[in-house]
């Protein structure tokens, strides 16, 4: 299955109120830095309360996911398949095709969650979810619907195109680097200082590391360490 984009989920940033855009912009900046090291032209966009990474036609999926997993501020990465918006019947066919490709022979519980960002769409979110769920059951008779605690949540977002995803890959969490001041980190040569640096960086602090080497009192082995 070829994924055309990634939906980026974040947690703490969402409660920042009127300052939320500052944290979102910082997260987008860090994502662009991480993705710039990968071959291909990626586009990171904020759209109606969401952050998406739009991928080039040819890209390394595993390398892209790994880069995003190391960006503080991201709690979840959802691989997205994008379909053209050509009416409900075509959307239903596309969603069933997605299930057949990503979850062949599925026999567990599921629910369809629809988000209608395109408010001009003539069918409500609940109606879309119910109808799509029925179409999926027709193709997967051993599956069952559970709207409270499903094993699989199939998300459908109706925008200018149809965005479909069902997987969330765990991110690093925390806050984007640069949103909570700066700090100096003294690297002592042990494991404690880099761990402390990682933990404070995860809270959005920009770290500058310092190491003191004082020969002959500091051995070459300690320097290498």
What would you call each of these model-derived segments?
Residues 1-184, 194-224:
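RNA-binding accessory domains that recognize and position tRNA/RNA substrates
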Residues 190:
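Conserved G/P- and acidic residue-centered "switch" motifs that form tight phosphate/ATP-binding loops
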């Amino acid at each position: 299955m070829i994924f055309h984009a990634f939906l980026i989920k974040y947690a703490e940033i969402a409660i920042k109120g009127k300052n939320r855009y500052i944290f979102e912009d910082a997260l987008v900046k860090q994502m662009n830095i991480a993705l710039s090291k990968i071959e291909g032209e990626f586009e990171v966009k904020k759209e109606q309360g969401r952050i998406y990474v739009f991928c080039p036609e040819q890209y390394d999926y595993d390398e892209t996911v790994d880069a995003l997993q190391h960006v503080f501020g991201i709690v979840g990465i959802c691989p997205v398949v994008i379909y053209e918006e050509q009416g409900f019947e075509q959307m239903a066919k596309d969603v069933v095709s997605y299930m057949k490709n990503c979850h062949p022979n599925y026999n567990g519980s599921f629910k369809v969650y629809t988000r209608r960002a395109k408010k001009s769409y003539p069918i409500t979110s609940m109606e879309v979810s119910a109808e799509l769920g029925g179409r999926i059951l027709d193709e997967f008779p051993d599956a069952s619907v559970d709207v409270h605690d499903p094993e699989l949540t199939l998300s459908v977002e109706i925008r200018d195109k149809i965005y479909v995803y069902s997987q969330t890959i765990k991110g690093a969490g925390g806050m984007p680097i640069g949103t909570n001041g700066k700090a100096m980190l003294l690297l002592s040569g042990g494991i404690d200082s880099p761990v402390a640096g990682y933990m404070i960086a995860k809270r959005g602090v920009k770290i500058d590391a310092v190491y003191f080497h004082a020969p002959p009192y500091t051995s070459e082995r300690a320097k290498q360490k």
